[in-house]
């Protein structure tokens, strides 16, 4: 009985995080992924730094100096948050402009490649024709040798 319950629990708990094919979530843009990673990193640094500052203030040296670093750390954290909020739209605008410019370049490159393809196509056709003729000549030359070896 325990094995059945354990098996069902593992089955449902691991399957509950699965992504079904009918879910139509839009994929996250690279910029959103970078923003999320930076946010996670900054939050981790803030939390880790807060712990170290609290430990320092609790120590004898911290009590003796009475620097109140924890208050300064909180101020620094709120300043970083405000800065991130102010920089967000500017960086988003930068990435949007970059995407537009790269799209224009991509279209120009596609057009140029199509022109090159059209210019090169006659040469490729001529090469293929000559190649087929050469192969046919070699076949004709080798055919008597093949029949000779079979006999």
UniProtKB/Swiss-Prot annotation:
Residues 19-24 form a propeptide. Glycosylated. Keywords: Cholesterol metabolism, Glycoprotein, HDL, Lipid metabolism, Lipid transport, Lipoprotein, Oxidation, Palmitate, Phosphoprotein, Repeat, Secreted, Signal, Steroid metabolism, Sterol metabolism, Transport. It comes from the Eukaryota. InterPro entries: ApoA_E, Apolipoprotein_A1/A4/E. Residues 1-18 form the signal peptide. GO terms for molecular function: cholesterol transfer activity; phosphatidylcholine-sterol O-acyltransferase activator activity; phospholipid binding; protein homodimerization activity. Residues 67-143 are annotated as: 4 X approximate tandem repeats. The modification Methionine sulfoxide is found at residue 109. Gene3D superfamilies: Apolipoprotein. This is Apolipoprotein A-I.
């Amino acid at each position: 009985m325990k094995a059945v319950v354990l098996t069902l629990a593992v089955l449902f708990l691991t399957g509950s995080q699965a992504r079904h094919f009918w879910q139509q979530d839009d994929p996250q843009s690279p910029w959103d992924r970078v923003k999320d990673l930076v946010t996670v990193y900054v939050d981790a640094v803030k939390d880790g730094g807060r712990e170290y500052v609290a430990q320092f203030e609790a120590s004898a040296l911290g009590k003796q100096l009475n620097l109140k670093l924890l208050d300064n750390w909180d101020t620094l954290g709120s300043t970083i948050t405000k800065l991130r909020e102010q920089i967000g739209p500017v960086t988003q605008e930068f990435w949007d402009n970059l995407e537009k410019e790269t799209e224009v370049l991509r279209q120009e490159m596609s057009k140029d490649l199509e022109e090159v393809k059209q210019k090169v196509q006659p040469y490729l056709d001529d090469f293929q024709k000559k190649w087929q003729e050469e192969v046919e000549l070699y076949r004709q030359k080798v055919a008597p040798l093949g029949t000779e070896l079979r006999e």
